[in-house]
From Swiss-Prot:
It catalyses: 2'-deoxyribonucleotide-(2'-deoxyribose 5'-phosphate)-2'-deoxyribonucleotide-DNA = a 3'-end 2'-deoxyribonucleotide-(2,3-dehydro-2,3-deoxyribose 5'-phosphate)-DNA + a 5'-end 5'-phospho-2'-deoxyribonucleoside-DNA + H(+); Exonucleolytic cleavage in the 3'- to 5'-direction to yield nucleoside 5'-phosphates. Belongs to the DNA repair enzymes AP/exoA family. It comes from Methanothermobacter thermautotrophicus (strain ATCC 29096 / DSM 1053 / JCM 10044 / NBRC 100330 / Delta H) (Methanobacterium thermoautotrophicum). Its cofactor is Mg(2+). The active site is at D151. Its EC number is 4.2.99.18, 3.1.11.2. GO terms for biological process: base-excision repair. Involved in DNA uracil repair. Recognizes DNA uracil residues within double-stranded DNA and initiates DNA-U repair by endonucleotic incision on the 5'-side of the 2'-d-uridine residue, irrespective of the nature of the opposing nucleotide. In addition, acts as an apurinic/apyrimidinic (AP) endonuclease hydrolyzing the DNA phosphodiester backbone immediately at the 5'-side of AP sites, and as a 3'-5' exonuclease. Strongly binds to double-stranded DNA. Mg(2+) 2 binds at D151, N153, H248. This is DNA uridine endonuclease. Keywords: DNA damage, DNA repair, DNA-binding, Hydrolase, Lyase, Magnesium, Metal-binding.
Amino acid sequence: MTVLKIISWNVNGLRAVHRKGFLKWFMEEKPDILCLQEIKAAPEQLPRKLRHVEGYRSFFTPAERKGYSGVAMYTKVPPSSLREGFGVERFDTEGRIQIADFDDFLLYNIYFPNGKMSEERLKYKLEFYDAFLEDVNRERDSGRNVIICGDFNTAHREIDLARPKENSNVSGFLPVERAWIDKFIENGYVDTFRMFNSDPGQYTWWSYRTRARERNVGWRLDYFFVNEEFKGKVKRSWILSDVMGSDHCPIGLEIEL
């Protein structure tokens, strides 16, 4: 039996978090796979030591727009293939999608859109959700096991944010967004963190504006999901809430293969 440790983190700028000790943390944590969201850089804008980390293969999927969005993956064992989109141009150009084939499972590293900016962006977010669900269902229905990680930009239930009442009309906790997560789960996917932890006060994002983190006024926006058939392989799912450097903290998953 092999235990695989996967970490997911919205770093809110890879160059910024690098200046705050990212590589030291990475080398101490030693995940088998590290998925990053919101890297805000193309590979050529990154220092060499971020592009080439000893013992890892790295894959960068930047947005076409400079300094925006983008996802990355560092992995000890290279995937047999890596797909960077759903085949829908308006979603695939924003650097939000990596789908890596590790033979035993497909790993989706996704930075889901934020719907706060405008009605138009909320519509884009919901359409992105549906394109993702269609893609992951197709893979799962063909017999693949899947792990989905990343920043979903939505808190699912009242337990998943500190102030649900005040935020019921705010994107990130709108009924329509929460209903999509319900639908996702009904399609046969499991929120792995809630397999192990049913406590309130468990968050992964805190606003920079109001010293929210020291008061733990946060939201749980980052998730590891697996398909129902694969959940027996999940040994642990946790939040690394003491890791600083971004407005999000990392989350972890251990699976036994």
